[in-house]
Amino acid sequence: MRLVISLIAGVLIVGCSSQSNQHDIQDRVSSGSVLFLRGDMTNWDALPEYKVQQTSTRLFSVKANLPEAGKTYHFKFADAQWNPSMNYGTAIDDAALSLNRPLPVRAYSYLDELKFTPEQAGTYEFMLDFRGHKPVALVKLAQ
């Protein structure tokens, strides 16, 4: 019985610490840590025009022109220094974003790039959304 209680306590502690860690990361983004859209469209550089802006509580976005329809663009949300805790990529192996459909993301994603293939050339809004239980990325056609 003690073993069962110990196992349950361990699971609860680990679950709480990972949830707390996720909130710490969200709070850092909210409180001034600067993220950029970094990828094929920026030559993987942290360019000022691709700085992610907070658009509402726990929601961040940036617009980017994608000039080639049908081309797969690889990208991440990351700070200028590629700090692991501020390096967001896909949480699902080899998953691709579809227009207007959220995809889970995670920090500490060293090689897990996000990817999106637009059906038409144009300006798109890339969003990082912390409002739900787990963070997601979303791409919309900009208005």
Located regions from the model:
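Sec-dependent signal peptide recognition
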Residues: M1-A9
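Aromatic-rich carbohydrate-binding modules that target alpha-glucans
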Residues: D27-G70, A80-R106
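Bacterial signal peptide processing site
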Residues: S17-S20
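C-terminal motif of bacterial Sec signal peptides marking the signal peptidase cleavage site
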Residues: L12-G15
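Short, exposed beta-strand-loop hairpins at the edges of beta-sheets
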Residues: K115-L141
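Beta-strand-rich extracellular modules
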Residues: A78-A80, R131
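Exposed beta-strand face motif in extracellular beta-rich ectodomains
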Residues: K71-Y73, Y124
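Short strand-edge motifs at loop-to-beta-strand transitions and within beta-strands
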Residues: R58-V62, D112-L114, Y124
